[in-house]
Amino acid sequence: MSPSLQEGAQLGESKPSTCSFSIERILGLDQNKDCVPLMKPHRPWADTCSSSGKDGNLCLHVPNPPSGISFPSVVDHPMPEERALKYENYFSASERLSLKRELSWYRGRRPRTAFTQNQIEVLENVFRVNCYPGIDIREDLAQKLNLEEDRIQIWFQNRRAKLKRSHRESQFLMAKKNFNTNLLE
């Protein structure tokens, strides 16, 4: 084997150096799995275990079961959905709802905002004037309507999507009407 090939083979056998810009480093694959994540998702509507000292992870609060029924310990292990559903007959409806909300599939979902009729009227009036309000208008609306600014931003996004959908449907109906009248002639 030539000297240059031997050097290449030796380089391939050597342990790769750790670069700050390697794929493993960027993706965090070179770290322990027990490391605390640098960023936690912002979910103010979810309860955290601040008192348990478990890095602020979401807790699963399970009520005491009726006598004679034993459950696996849930203090150290999160309860999977299948296991929780197996025991759902032993809990009241409100306890089951609370349990469902605390399961992992529900953690990331924010509760739906129920707008009052007054709030909807004000938002619709503003939408008629400006369907793309700036941050200053949204913040004023949030203060006046006692809502969060991000809820107002989402409302306007949804309202624009509704307008676009209705416009598309009306265009389709007009085209369909024209097509039908042309066929009858």
From Swiss-Prot:
GO terms for biological process: camera-type eye development; canonical Wnt signaling pathway; cellular response to cadmium ion; ERK1 and ERK2 cascade; forebrain morphogenesis; gene expression; gonad development; leukemia inhibitory factor signaling pathway. Pfam families: Homeodomain. The keyword Ribonucleoprotein does not apply. One of its GO terms (cellular component) is nucleus. Its main location: nucleus. InterPro entries: HD (IPR001356), Hesx1 (IPR043402), Homeobox_CS (IPR017970), Homeodomain-like_sf (IPR009057). The keyword Transcription applies. PROSITE patterns: HOMEOBOX_1, HOMEOBOX_2. It is found in: Nucleus. Keywords: Developmental protein, DNA-binding, Homeobox, Nucleus, Transcription, Transcription regulation. One of its GO terms (molecular function) is RNA polymerase II cis-regulatory region sequence-specific DNA binding. Residues 108-167 bind DNA. Belongs to the ANF homeobox family. Required for the normal development of the forebrain, eyes and other anterior structures such as the olfactory placodes and pituitary gland. Possible transcriptional repressor. Binds to the palindromic PIII sequence, 5'-AGCTTGAGTCTAATTGAATTAACTGTAC-3'. HESX1 and PROP1 bind as heterodimers on this palindromic site, and, in vitro, HESX1 can antagonize PROP1 activation. PANTHER family: HOMEOBOX EXPRESSED IN ES CELLS 1 (PTHR46966:SF1). Can form heterodimers with PROP1 in binding to DNA. Interacts with TLE1. This is Homeobox expressed in ES cells 1. It comes from Pan troglodytes. The lineage of its organism: Eukaryota, Metazoa, Chordata, Craniata, Vertebrata. The gene is HESX1.
